[in-house]
Amino acid sequence: MKKAVLSLCLALSTSFLLAGGDLSPVEPVEAGKVCHQDLTYVEEDVNLMWQDQQYTDAEDSAVARTHNSGKAGTWNHAMSYCRSLYYAGYSDWRLPTSDELQHVHRIDGQVFTHFRDKDFWTSTPTTENKYYVVYPADAYIYKRYRSETNFIRCVRCTGENNKETN
C-alpha cells in the first residue's frame, strides 16, 4: 500500500512537471507592499471625510465609567484626540460642529461601518460650560457638560486646499 501511494505521488509529480507546471516557491510579500486602508466615509456634497474606525472595549468602558480612552472621553479629551489624530494618511482632523454631525446622521441608512448608539461630541458650545452632542439614531442634539464622557468621531475637510501629499 505504501509503495502504491508513493508511486502515485511520483507519477503525479512527474506529470505536473512534464505538463509545464511551475513548482517555484511563492515569493514572500514585502512588508512595505502590504497596505491596510483606514476606513472613512466621505460626504462629497459637503466635502467632509469622516473617521470610521472600530471602537474598542476600553472606549465602551470609558463612556460607561466616565474616563478617557481613545475615541471616548470628556470634551477636552475629544478636542485633543482629534487635533492629534493621524488617520487614513491625514493629520488635519478636528471635532465636527453640531450641524456637520447632524447632517451625516440624517442620511438614510447607516453610513458608518463602526458606530455606537450613544452620544457623540461636537465642537459647538451651548451655555453654562456645555457643548452639544448628537445622538446618531435620531440626529438630535443635546447639551452636555464638558466633564461628561461621550464618544468621538473626527472629521476633516476634503476640498482642494486641504489635500496632503503622502
Region roles according to the model:
Residues 2-5, 16-94, 98-166:
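Glycine-aromatic-enriched surface loops/turns that form tight recognition elements
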Residues 6-10:
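Sec-dependent N-terminal signal peptides
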